[in-house]
Amino acid sequence: MTIKTVKDAINDALVQSFEEDKNVILMGEDIAGGKGREQYQGTQDAWGGPFGVTQGLYTKFGGERVRDTTIAEAGFFGAAIGAAMTGLRPIVELMYVDFAGVCFDQMMNQAAKVRYMFGGKQKVPMVVRTVVGAGFRAGSEHSQTLYSLYTHIPGLKVVAPYDAYDAKGLLLSSIKDDDPVIFMEHKRLYMTSCEVPDDLKPIPLGKGRIRREGSDVTIIAIQRMNLFAEEAADELEKINISCETVSYTHLTLPTSHCV
């Protein structure tokens, strides 16, 4: 058991997936240091994306599997869908979920529909990692969550981890899944930490998590709102109301078994 931040847990899951499956690749803007990195030997992973989540991957696995892209989401999302349909397992980093509009056709009309269009025979095993949430004094176009934008599209699975345990286990499962998964990472949770088993296995998608037992009322929360759910439960306990708290981590499958 090791104390891990959400950021480090995601990095661990990426490394483990790369080591287990040679068909896993990663692409996105500045995930390997940005264009021109060749001039700065030893600093290829200096940035690792806007929040440093992919640091070390380029050095460890090389440029064939960890690829910086141009600022053209429509292009590299289309490339990822094609790669997924022909045997690879691409992980695409959409720098902020706010930029979903520039690659929405690719996700809504291609990735989400391919399995249905081919009678269930064609797989699209790809993961879109993207950052959501406000709280860093960023502009309005870098501060949204847009959960429902994706949950209303049949064919997409939307995963929203809360802590490091969820982040690692759910990302491992998402990468192994044969359908497109939108994996939403809340920027205000990256540096929060908890215990993570060193041998953590993939956590099945579609399972919520009971974080606190209670018998009177149930509070259901997503991502950072779990912090406030716990605070509310503490206040209710003071007036003898036993409160159960449930974290929903898969937003497109019902998790009523938790309630």
Can you say where each PLM-predicted feature lies in the sequence?
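Short, glycine/serine-rich, charged loops/turns that create anion-binding
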Residues: 31, 133, 187-188, 224-226, ...
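Glycine-/acidic-rich phosphate or pyrophosphate-binding loops and their flanking alpha/beta elements
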Residues: 9-13, 168-180, 191-235
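Hydrophobic, well-ordered secondary-structure elements that form the walls
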Residues: 26, 80, 219, 236, ...
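Short helix-loop-beta junction
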Residues: 56-63, 228-245
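Active-site proximal loops enriched in glycine and acidic residues that flank catalytic Cys/His/Asp
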Residues: 185, 221-223, 247-248
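Thiamine diphosphate
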Residues: 1-180, 184
